[in-house]
Amino acid sequence: MSRVGKMPITIPAGVDVSIKEDQISVKGTGGTLNLARNPLVKVVSNDGKLNFEPANESREANAMSGTIRQLVNNMVVGVTKGFEKKLNLVGVGYKAAASNNKLNLQVGYSHPVNIDMPQGITVATATPTEIVIKGADRQRVGQIAAEIRAVRPPEPYKGKGIRYSDEKIVIKETKKK
């Protein structure tokens, strides 16, 4: 059995987990998240803990038990604490402004780039060169952060562009005569 799948999830106070035939719902202060149930994984709830077991002895069911367990754990953490990603803008004149769930980027193009945030995702700019994306759904937070980064990814010679705050850019050496 999967090492991750063996570990139970402790359900904190204030979080309601409901297991139905076709989906698992997690409700908390951060909102409600749903996950489609996989027929290869059995979900058992007892004494404030969730256990995940493969429905049969196949390798696929074993792997899926760990995957589903981690997805549900991310849902529980998301509705209690939430997830956040930080992005930095590096470059002369690069700046960002957030207002009304919209992000306005000026990153060296002839026009500003506007990005609408989906429901459940909030964006803030602490400084004009720092973007903070927050939300309960880990996948959506990461996806929006990747889409923002893709507007102007860091280039390898000067490092200009939009990067994750913990990302290290390896700077290439320029061609010498």
Swiss-Prot record:
Coiled coil: none annotated. One of its GO terms (biological process) is cytoplasmic translation. InterPro entries: Ribosomal_uL6-like (IPR000702), Ribosomal_uL6-like_a/b-dom_sf (IPR036789), Ribosomal_uL6_a/b-dom (IPR020040), Ribosomal_uL6_bac-type (IPR019906), Ribosomal_uL6_CS (IPR002358). GO terms for cellular component: cytosolic large ribosomal subunit. Keywords: Ribonucleoprotein, Ribosomal protein, RNA-binding, rRNA-binding. One of its GO terms (molecular function) is rRNA binding. Pfam families: Ribosomal_L6 (PF00347). Part of the 50S ribosomal subunit. Belongs to the universal ribosomal protein uL6 family. This protein binds to the 23S rRNA, and is important in its secondary structure. It is located near the subunit interface in the base of the L7/L12 stalk, and near the tRNA binding site of the peptidyltransferase center. This is Large ribosomal subunit protein uL6. It comes from Variovorax paradoxus (strain S110). The lineage of its organism: Bacteria, Pseudomonadati, Pseudomonadota, Betaproteobacteria, Burkholderiales. The gene is rplF.
